[in-house]
Design a protein with these regions (language model features):
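Bacterial N-terminal signal peptides that target proteins for export
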Residues: 1-9
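Detector for Asparagine
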Residues: 4, 32, 91-94
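Bacterial N-terminal signal peptides
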Residues: 8-16
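N-terminal mature-domain "stem" immediately C-terminal to a signal peptide or N-terminal signal-anchor/transmembrane
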Residues: 22-68
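Acidic/His-rich structured neighborhood in mature extracellular/periplasmic domains
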Residues: 59, 64-125
């Protein structure tokens, strides 16, 4: 009887201490929702443009998505298939680029204005 109680208590404490484990959303649903709301595709379908004013108003949602990216450990990333890894990298690159633009928005005319001749905007600390 005592050992069952001990095992139950140990299992409960393990769950309590470790906290909830959230699996990474490989559908990137929250990022896709932002894109649906704030990206306009050209009539021809060959290009698109971000509506940064709208994205700025949804910045809290963008930051929440970026936090989910930051929570991915190298071990988790390495356990994914190549397609999931590629989707993660592409979506992370694009989401962080939007965040970089929003840091200077609305005073920014072009993303190219973020850097300089000798310094990439992506190497900024």
């Amino acid at each position: 009887m005592m050992s069952k109680r001990f095992l139950w208590l140990a299992a409960w404490l393990t769950l309590f201490i470790s906290g909830p484990v959230r699996a990474f959303d490989h559908t990137h649903r929250s990022w896709n929702e932002l894109l649906v709301r704030h990206v306009v595709v050209s009539k021809e379908g060959y290009s698109s443009a971000v509506r940064y004013a709208g994205m700025q108003s949804d910045r809290a949602a963008l930051k929440r998505y970026l936090m989910t990216l930051e929570e991915v450990s190298p071990r988790d990333y390495e356990s994914w298939g190549k397609g999931q890894q590629l989707a993660f990298l592409i979506n992370a690159y694009n989401a962080w680029t939007v965040e970089l633009v929003l840091q200077k928005y609305p005073d920014l005319k072009s993303i190219k204005d973020l850097g300089s001749t000798f310094r990439s905007p992506w190497k900024k600390k």
